[in-house]
């Protein structure tokens, strides 16, 4: 798999998972995301350096983001449960990032959640000042 190849090359792979708005509204988000994780990690028992990012497809480039509660529901639920079913207690060492339109205004709310270890920042990272504000908000929430 690409994840396995990246690890073998000494890279820190990021497996991005997320659902469409239609999948979310149909109540299938958890199943879709669990399937994405299983497909992405199939045949790979190595969790070294692995990062999983939850990036709801419906939030990419829209300025919309999942509520922190929704992010926790997916990340602390479907993602962590699937990782634990595949890797047991080693799953607790996998970094979980939120990546759905994180910005300086909402980064602290996400980072304050125990199951969210950081952010996969897109548009807000294009300008140094904006990115530094995101980093400061995350650092303050994790302090």
Where are these regions (language model features)?
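Active-site loop-to-helix "anion-binding N-cap" substructures in soluble metabolic enzymes
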Residues: 1-143
């Amino acid at each position: 798999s690409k994840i396995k190849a990246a690890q073998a090359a000494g890279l820190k792979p990021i497996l991005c998972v997320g659902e469409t708005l239609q999948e979310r509204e149909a109540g299938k988000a958890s199943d879709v995301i669990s399937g994405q994780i299983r497909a992405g990690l199939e045949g790979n028992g190595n969790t070294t350096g692995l990062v999983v990012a939850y990036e709801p497809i419906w939030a990419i480039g829209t300025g919309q983001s999942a509520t922190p509660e929704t992010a926790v529901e997916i990340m602390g639920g479907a993602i962590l449960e699937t990782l634990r079913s595949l890797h047991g207690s080693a799953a607790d060492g996998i970094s979980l990032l939120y990546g759905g339109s994180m910005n300086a205004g909402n980064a602290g709310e996400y980072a304050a959640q125990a199951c969210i270890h950081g952010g996969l920042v897109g548009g807000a990272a294009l300008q140094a000042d904006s990115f530094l504000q995101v980093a400061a908000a995350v650092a303050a929430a994790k302090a």
